[in-house]
Amino acid sequence: MCQKGFEATSMNDIADAVGLTKAGIYHYIRGKEDLLFEIMSYGMDMVDEDVIAPAQKISDPEERLRTIVERHAKRILEVGGAVTILLEEMSALTPAHRRTIRGRKRAYYELIRRTLEQLAAEGKLRSVDLTVATFSLLGMINWMSRWYRGDGRLSPPQIVKDFREVALNAVLKSPGIVA
């Protein structure tokens, strides 16, 4: 699904990729849409565990934002193109599954927005609209799945460091530098 997209990927493609027959794959899933939902749910589980849960434990909003940006960027570099499924295949889900995934994405959006609201209240946020800033940060991070190549000249830690600086400087008046 990562390479071809949902519509162009057949159940035979999926069965071949996991070393099963087409009939055998139905022992594990009811259909392609159920598999898509499971993939998206797994992606959101990773965000919950690797980004949201650690960030929610941090009371300082600047440190929380830094953690969100770093951890999400690191996760994108680790899973690569698989993120595109979560970003681009929502319309292939049933309405009930779409609501579930949208709700989980919305909770993450709200965490970032609340963090930016706290930074604004402390006078640390640039004079930017919170909705624009929140979607911009999410867009910047998620777009890494499009351009990052593991064989590039920069190491993942260097990319995360540089990305963090770009992202924080985009929204904060004077971000503290953390090596």
What is the role of each PLM region?
Residues 96-104:
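Alpha-helical segment immediately C-terminal to the catalytic phospho-histidine in histidine kinases
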Residues 3-7, 58, 79, 122-123:
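Short coil/turn segments at alpha/beta junctions that flank glycine-rich nucleotide-binding fingerprints
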